[in-house]
């Protein structure tokens, strides 16, 4: 009995030990998974950074987003935005001595040189010209940099920036010249949404014609990532003060996903590497898929004055992006048609917009178009009645007219018969009264 008891106890102890080992292993696995999840968040050298998804309207990554930092030459994105919104690109500017004397990165402007606003904008955003920035600030500020800085601050306030203040247009070190990563996401987004700024900031090389004071220039971008094929970086601006105090503000646009990335207090050697790391992190957090099928009808639109007044509509095509932890079931679409769609229409004509929502939040839109030509219809088409319906209505009206005519005639005939019936009865009665009565009073006469 003692042996049996010992064996049972040994088995029980083994079971307890195995259970403990399993629990420990599962705990270790969970801890490992937690560590893995944490390591997925990029570790970067920049003191402050933010990665924002324009497509899904969400902040994907932030490191000290509200910390005050010096923007350095990324300031020039705001300078470019203000200039693009208030000046004519063809306007000629005469470079002042003060502008020509600017140090640091320049496009080598000469005092008295006559250049256009467009040429200065390329020098500003590609060559990061401090001289170009100063010349633009003077031109747009009626000769006063203080006036131009006030315009920059007013524009920042309009964008909702609460931790930003500009003193100059080039970003050179100055007291009370600062921003935050959270604010600069708004500034970069607005600047790169401007067609002029986007085109210039997305240019790799610009060939500038000779001026009255200088030979032709070749201006190249300082943005490293835009040079790399397949990087998805389409435009932006770098900033530099020292090797361990650099900045960048750029736009990524690839496969339907658009993001804004800003870094401040970054290391010169790792700025581009960290930028690529953050962009990769952003693409992994977002799912990209087709929200609509351009070949499948999404609805119908009523067409006024058309030979056909109810026409199928198709989405021109859009790619939807939404958070990876979201669900495709949360996607919905809403058709918005023009108040009045009039014929004639050609295949491909826009008749409305299809809005795409994810969890109730608008995340995209695409034009709604027709895939056929619609000619003008007949008179009733002004009441949204098609030619085919007009024919059908005509046939129905003719049939109704025939039926009504038949019924009217039959009713008239019946009334006529009802009117004539008494007369016919009188005539019949009169005829009956004229016939002699056949009274056989003398039956014997039949044998005479």
Cite the ranges covered by each PLM segment.
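Short, Lys/Arg-rich N-terminal segment immediately upstream of the first membrane anchor
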Residues: 2-10, 39, 62, 379-385
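Active-site-adjacent loops and short helices of periplasmic peptidoglycan-processing enzymes
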Residues: 5-6, 31-200, 254
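Intrinsically disordered, low-complexity repeat and linker tracts
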Residues: 7-10, 23-26, 30-33, 297-301, ...
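Internal alpha-helical transmembrane segments of multi-pass membrane proteins, especially GPCRs
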Residues: 15-19, 82, 202
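N-terminal, intrinsically disordered, polar/charged segments of Gram-positive cell-envelope systems
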Residues: 34-42, 50-51, 56, 419-447
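Domain-terminus/edge residues, biased toward the C-terminal soluble/receptor-binding domains
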Residues: 161-162, 173-422, 440-448
């Amino acid at each position: 009995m003692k042996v049996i008891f010992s064996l049972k106890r040994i088995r029980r102890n083994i079971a307890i030990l195995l259970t403990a080992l399993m629990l420990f292993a599962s705990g270790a696995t969970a801890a490992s998974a937690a560590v893995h999840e944490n390591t997925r968040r990029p570790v970067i050298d920049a003191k402050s950074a933010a990665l924002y998804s324009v497509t899904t309207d969400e902040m994907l990554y932030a490191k000290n987003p509200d910390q005050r930092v010096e923007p350095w030459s990324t300031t020039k994105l705001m300078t470019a935005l203000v200039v693009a919104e208030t000046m004519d690109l063809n306007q000629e500017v005469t470079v002042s001595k003060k502008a020509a004397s600017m140090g640091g990165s320049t496009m080598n402007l000469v005092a008295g040189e006559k250049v256009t606003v467009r040429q200065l904008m390329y020098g500003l955003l590609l060559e990061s010209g401090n001289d170009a920035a100063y010349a633009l600030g003077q031109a747009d500020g009626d000769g006063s940099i203080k006036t131009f800085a006030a315009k920059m601050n007013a524009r920042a306030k309009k964008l909702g920036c609460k931790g930003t203040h500009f003193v100059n247009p080039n970003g050179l070190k100055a007291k009370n010249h600062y921003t935050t990563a959270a604010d600069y996401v708004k500034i970069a987004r607005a600047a790169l949404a401007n067609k002029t700024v986007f085109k210039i900031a997305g240019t790799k090389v610009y060939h500038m014609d000779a001026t009255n004071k200088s030979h032709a220039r070749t201006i190249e971008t300082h943005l490293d990532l835009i040079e790399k094929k397949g990087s998805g970086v389409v435009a932006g601006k770098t900033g530099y003060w020292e090797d361990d105090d650099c900045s960048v503000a750029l736009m990524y646009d690839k496969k339907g996903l658009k993001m804004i990335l800003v870094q401040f207090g970054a290391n010169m050697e790792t700025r581009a590497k960290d930028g690529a790391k953050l962009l990769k992190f952003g693409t992994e957090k977002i799912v990209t898929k087709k929200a609509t099928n351009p070949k499948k009808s999404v609805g119908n639109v009523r067409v006024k004055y058309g030979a056909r007044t109810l026409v199928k509509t198709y989405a021109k095509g859009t790619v939807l992006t939404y958070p990876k932890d979201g669900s495709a079931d949360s996607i919905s679409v809403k058709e918005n048609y023009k108040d009045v769609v009039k014929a004639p229409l050609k295949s491909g004509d826009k008749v409305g917009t299809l809005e795409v929502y994810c969890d109730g939040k608008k995340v995209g839109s695409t034009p709604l178009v027709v895939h056929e030509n619609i000619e003008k219809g007949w008179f009733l088409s002004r009441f949204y009645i098609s030619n085919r319906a007009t024919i059908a209505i005509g046939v129905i009206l003719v049939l109704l007219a025939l039926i009504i005519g038949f019924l009217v005639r039959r009713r008239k005939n019946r009334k006529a018969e009802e009117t004539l019936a008494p007369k016919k009865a009188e005539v019949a009665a009169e005829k009956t009264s004229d016939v002699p009565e056949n009274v056989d009073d003398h039956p014997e006469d039949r044998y005479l």
